């Protein structure tokens, strides 16, 4: 497979769009090396995760939304964001790349396990740095709080 990892913020990952199914993921990327179900009783969430370890990413599917693709975690060094190999960029370069593309840094946080998180909420993007080097990226769909729908009985 000639795979080119590309972040398409608010849309998807490479040729795989948010809202697509597990079957569609497997038709594009093949069978995952591992899959698992993650449940969070406090947040009342559940997702199925397809891990493509050799390709450097994991796909998350929302079990409470018909198992639709909702987010991805990437650590592949060849990943491209806005034409740049994002894993070769330093923190300030990532912030600048996002800024010139219309997204501002929302928050930063030092994680318990040692990584520093840069959050770009409007883009649905979190970048994790360890010792000044980008180590992983999480991005996904954004829940629109204004899209609440009331369905009468």
Tell me what each language-model feature is.
Residues 1-153:
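Short helix/turn-capping signatures at newly exposed starts of structured segments
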